[in-house]
C-alpha cells in the first residue's frame, strides 16, 4: 500500500478509495457529479475540476477514471442514454399488450420521478441545445433515437390497425415526440414552470387529439 501511495497521482486518501468503493460505483459517482455540473454550468463550461469538487474528490481521481474531459462527457451521455432507454423499455415491458396500453406506457415513462428531474432535464437540454454538444449527442445517441422513433411509429401504426384510426404513423409519432421534448424544455426555461404531472397531461391532451376514443388528458380511457 505504501508503494501505491508513493507512485499514485491520486494521493494517499484517494489511492485508498478503490478499496472502499468498486470501480464501477466510483465511476457512477463521478458521472452523477458530471450531470450536476452540466445542469448547473452548461456543457461547454463543465470542467474536470468542477466535477471533482461536486463529487468531493480529487481532480486526479477524475483523471484516473476518464483521462480527458471528452471521455467524461461521452461516458456521461452514454449513461443518460442507457438510463433513458431502460426507463421506457421497462415500462412498456410491464404494460399490457394492447397498442393503447403500450403507447401510454412509452410516453408516460418520460415523466416518472426518477427520470424527470430538473437536473437531468437540464443536462439533456445542454447536450441538445449547445452547439458544442450536438455533434457528441448525434454521434453517440443517433441509433437509440432512431430505435425509439421506430417503436413509437410502430405503436401509432398499431393504433390504426387495431382500433380503426387512419393517421400517418410517422407524422403522428413525430408530433408526440416533439411535444414531449417541448414540455421538457418548458419545464427548464419558463419563469414559472409547471411540474411533471401537468407536462404529462399536456402530452396526453395531444395524444387524445389523435386517438380520442382511447386517451384523454388524464391518460388512458
Regions found by a protein language model. Name each.
Residues 90, 116-125, 135-161, 171, ...:
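Amphipathic alpha-helical packing segments from all-alpha helical-bundle domains
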Amino acid at each position: 500500500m505504501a508503494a501505491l501511495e508513493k507512485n499514485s497521482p491520486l494521493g494517499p486518501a484517494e489511492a485508498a478509495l478503490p478499496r472502499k468503493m468498486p470501480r464501477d460505483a466510483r465511476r457512477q459517482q463521478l458521472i452523477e457529479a458530471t450531470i450536476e455540473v452540466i445542469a448547473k454550468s452548461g456543457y461547454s463550461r463543465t470542467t474536470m475540476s468542477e466535477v471533482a469538487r461536486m463529487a468531493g474528490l480529487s481532480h486526479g481521481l477524475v483523471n484516473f477514471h476518464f483521462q480527458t474531459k471528452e471521455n467524461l462527457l461521452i461516458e456521461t451521455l452514454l449513461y443518460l442514454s442507457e438510463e433513458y432507454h431502460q426507463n421506457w423499455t421497462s415500462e412498456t415491458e410491464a404494460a399490457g399488450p394492447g397498442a393503447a396500453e403500450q403507447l401510454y406506457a412509452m410516453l408516460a415513462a418520460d415523466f416518472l420521478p426518477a427520470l424527470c428531474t430538473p437536473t437531468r432535464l437540464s443536462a439533456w437540454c445542454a447536450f441538445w441545445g449547445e452547439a458544442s454538444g450536438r455533434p457528441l449527442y448525434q454521434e453517440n445517441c443517433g441509433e437509440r433515437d432512431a430505435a425509439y422513433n421506430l417503436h413509437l411509429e410502430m405503436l401509432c401504426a398499431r393504433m390504426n390497425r387495431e382500433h380503426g384510426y387512419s393517421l400517418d404513423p410517422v407524422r403522428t409519432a413525430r408530433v408526440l415526440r416533439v411535444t414531449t421534448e417541448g414540455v421538457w424544455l418548458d419545464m427548464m426555461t419558463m419563469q414559472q414552470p409547471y411540474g411533471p404531472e401537468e407536462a404529462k397531461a399536456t402530452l396526453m391532451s395531444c395524444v387524445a387529439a389523435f386517438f380520442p376514443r382511447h386517451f384523454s388528458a388524464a391518460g388512458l380511457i
